[in-house]
Amino acid sequence: MKAFYGMLVIFILCSTCYISVDSQIDTNVKCSGSSKCVKICIDRYNTRGAKCINGRCTCYP
């Protein structure tokens, strides 16, 4: 029974990681900081979740 709960926890963690990576939206907009991306993400995707990753804006719904 302990093995079942262990496998269930691993499955939930893997599913959450897969969904969170799949839900991000990469843009081709250059940025120098995450604060520059917020307006772009609000205008294009209606979300405030934004990060500047590798010089490009990434939006999170």
UniProtKB/Swiss-Prot annotation:
Subcellular location per the Swiss-Prot or TrEMBL entry: Secreted
InterPro entries, alphabetized: Scorpion_toxin-like_sf (IPR036574), Scorpion_toxinS_K_inh (IPR001947)
GO CC field: extracellular region
Record has Disulfide bond as a keyword: yes
Disulfide linkage: 31-52, 37-57, 41-59
Pyrrolidone carboxylic acid: residues carrying this PTM: 24
Expression across tissues: Expressed by the venom gland.
Site feature: Basic residue of the functional dyad: 51
Site keyed Aromatic residue of the functional dyad: positions: 60
Annotated effect of mutating residue 43 to K: Increase in blocking A-type potassium currents (IC(50)=96 nM). Decrease in blocking A-type potassium currents (IC(50)=335 nM). Decrease in blocking A-type potassium currents (IC(50)=235 nM)
PROSITE patterns: SCORP_SHORT_TOXIN
GO terms of biological process kind: envenomation resulting in negative regulation of voltage-gated potassium channel activity in another organism; venom-mediated suppression of platelet aggregation
Keyword annotations from UniProtKB, A to Z: Disulfide bond, Ion channel impairing toxin, Neurotoxin, Potassium channel impairing toxin, Pyrrolidone carboxylic acid, Secreted, Signal, Toxin, Voltage-gated potassium channel impairing toxin
Signal sequence interval, chain numbering: 1-23
Record flagged with keyword Hydrolase: no
Molecular function via GO: potassium channel inhibitor activity; toxin activity
Family that this chain belongs to: Belongs to the short scorpion toxin superfamily. Potassium channel inhibitor family. Alpha-KTx 15 subfamily.
Function: Irreversibly blocks the A-type voltage-gated potassium channels in rat cerebellum granular cells (190 nM induce 50% inhibitory effect) (IC(50)=190 nM). Also weakly inhibits Kv1.2/KCNA2 and Kv1.3/KCNA3.
Domain remarks: Has the structural arrangement of an alpha-helix connected to a beta-sheet by disulfide bonds (CSalpha/beta).
Additional detail: Negative results: does not block ERG1/Kv11.1/KCNH2 currents.
Annotated protein name in UniProt: Potassium channel toxin alpha-KTx 15.6
Native source organism of the sequence: Tityus discrepans
Species classification: Eukaryota, Metazoa, Ecdysozoa, Arthropoda, Chelicerata
